[in-house]
Amino acid sequence: VVLLASGCATAPPPTEQMASAKAAVESAAVDGAPAYAPAETRLASDKLAAAQKAVVAKDYVLAKQLAEESQLDAQLAVRKMQTAKSSKAADEARKAASTGGTQ
């Protein structure tokens, strides 16, 4: 148990994970994910903010975990957005095909 506790205390700041999470959250926002996956986008932002607070508190293990979760939530938001856009485009194509272009 002592080794595990000392391993946590010497964990380095999760600089790479924080940068990746921030980039993923920003990219999701710019791409329009909040309109299609608001819950996932908000969760990603909230976890990133919590990770930043954990870094300030020097709880690097928690910060790394939250940053990784934030990145995954942002990626999920983007995937949901892409799925919704693809579905909408397919519906529009079917609609256009069924009218036979008689507009």
Spans of features found by a protein language model:
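Long, charged/polar, soluble alpha-helical segments
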Residues: 4-103
